[in-house]
């Protein structure tokens, strides 16, 4: 069995009444990737994954093909399916999409977000202030903050486009929020964004969301170059 698969958290057995084992396999492998249990470059051999998930190879094969189509997996000669690795060109493309989509989400949230949704964002931002020196907790809170904005945008099609973008960011591993300076800057941008949403300033909210994404890109490129240097 692949060492990386062996060290990933063992999922619970698939439910006996599931309509599609392939769907279960897809969801569980995807979660292991986006949670960071399966790292970029990890090999996912059918037999090892089937043993890990306690199911046959057929649904696993279907799930791996679907994840490859999503861009979370790549196929390498002599290794088979591996968790995708993004080069700098792909990172730039990914963050260009993030900037555009998150800017649109912020503008839509300013126009359509309900007061209770804006209250939720205020509470999350306040919680975030107490987690700036706790990277794992901060990453989880940051995810909740952005998901709350996406929901407040009230656009199902935008959500469908954002999900693969954030999946792509997740496979890069270590969060840029582990850098204390970036954590402080990101929190300040979140507070600014909450204020603009409360004022229903769509143009201002979009501008800050785009700036926030560019700041994240700068931090990501710095981190990737540090990793490359070893």
Per-segment meaning from a language model:
Residues 2, 52, 180-230:
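C-terminal regulatory/effector modules of DNA-binding transcriptional regulators
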Residues 1-111, 221-230:
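Short linear motifs at protein or domain termini
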Residues 32, 36, 128, 165-172, ...:
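A short secondary-structure junction motif
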Residues 25-27, 42, 54, 58, ...:
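Short alpha-helical segments used as structural interaction elements across diverse proteins
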Residues 69, 73-74, 165-167, 181-184:
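Mobile beta-alpha loop/short-helix "lid" or hinge segments that flank ligand
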Residues 94, 98, 111-175, 187-199, ...:
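Conserved amphipathic alpha-helical segments that form helical-bundle/coiled-coil interaction surfaces
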